[in-house]
Swiss-Prot record:
Name of the molecule in the record: Possible hemolysin C
Family classification: Belongs to the UPF0053 family. Hemolysin C subfamily.
Gene designation: tlyC
CC annotations in GO: plasma membrane
Keywords in alphabetical order: CBS domain, Repeat
GO molecular function: flavin adenine dinucleotide binding
Protein source organism: Rickettsia bellii (strain OSU 85-389)
Domain CBS: 79-141, 144-201
Additional note from the record: It is not know if this bacteria is hemolytic.
Keyword Repeat: yes
């Protein structure tokens, strides 16, 4: 019995060692993402790893697939639109600031603007605010402000990562051609594009977070849910495999319509699939209802 147990232990150690070696080999190229420049052969290495992926777990394969997609993605693909930005005025006093943080903006970092949202002056970190709340002496919001960076919506995500590293900041304000604030992107947004959604203790579930299967022919979905996720549930293709124009169900609708459609607008994606806009504003699409003539492949909610 002892010999058998020793063999099992040795076998387990060998398996663990192989797994560790494999993971190191898999993720070593990803270190390049956090350097100031991505090597020219970065994606060729990733492609070779993906080709030889028989021993990889599903999560590992998904990360590699997302890495390859990341090459062509821009800030515009993942940014939080202007209409969804929560920010605080520079003139806010400490009592108002404390209340705003608790009630409206449950995040570790909060944008600060002077006058209008087109004049973002930086952001504050929650830990700096806590220190100020403790002392309450000579409070000046300006003293707490940290720097952000400016980026165009067309900037590649990999270039944004490198710039964030150089500038040592986690927040970028996206500026339109007229110099106005178009959106916001954080390093967390970029990492979610790579490894999937990252929930932390400040994230709160809402009706827009993911999707809900209402019945065998209806799904209510956040516009930011990826098309591939919904395709798996529906059992039908919503886009061609080589179509890189969009990744989310909202992107599909915007591509089909050419603009942000009004609530109640319906489009037929195929003979079996109809998409109806159930929530939107003039600048962004928030929620859609997907209706099928045939039943869903499998009914589940997220």
């Amino acid at each position: 019995m002892l010999k058998s147990s020793k063999k099992e232990d040795d076998s387990k150690k060998n398996h663990d060692n192989k797994s560790i070696f494999h993971l190191r080999k898999l993720f070593s190229p990803i270190k390049s993402l956090f350097s100031n420049k991505v090597p020219d052969d970065f994606f060729s290495v990733i492609k070779r790893l993906k080709t030889n992926s028989q021993k990889m777990t599903l999560d590992e394969r998904n990360i590699l697939a997302n890495l390859l997609k990341l090459k062509g993605k821009t800030i515009e693909d993942i940014m939080v639109p202007r209409s969804d930005i929560a920010a605080i005025k520079l003139t806010t006093n400490i009592e108002e600031l404390n209340e705003s943080i608790k009630v409206k903006i449950p995040h570790t970092r909060t944008l600060i603007y002077d006058g209008t949202l087109d004049n973002i002056v930086g952001f504050i970190h929650i830990k700096d605010l806590f220190k100020a709340l403790v002392t309450k002496q000579n409070f000046r919001l300006k003293k707490l402000i940290r720097k952000h960076i400016i980026a165009a919506p067309s900037m590649k995500l990999l270039d944004l990562l490198a710039k964030m590293r150089r500038e040592k900041t986690h927040i970028a304000i996206v500026i339109d051609e007229y110099g106005g604030t178009d959106g916001l992107v954080t390093i967390e947004d970029v990492m979610e594009a790579l490894v999937g959604r990252i929930d932390d203790e400040h994230d709160q579930k809402s009706e827009y977070d993911n999707y809900k299967v209402i019945n065998n022919s209806t799904i209510i979905s956040n516009a930011r849910v990826e098309v591939e996720v919904l395709e798996e549930i529906i059992g039908e293709k919503l886009k061609d495999d080589d179509d890189d124009e969009f990744d989310t169900i909202g992107g599909l609708v915007l591509t089909k319509m050419g603009n942000v459609p009004a609530v109640g607008t319906k489009i037929n994606v195929s003979e079996n699939i109809e998409i109806e806009v159930t929530d939107a504003n003039p600048r962004s699409l928030k929620q859609v209802k997907i209706t099928l003539k045939n039943s869903l492949k499998r009914a589940k909610s997220s």
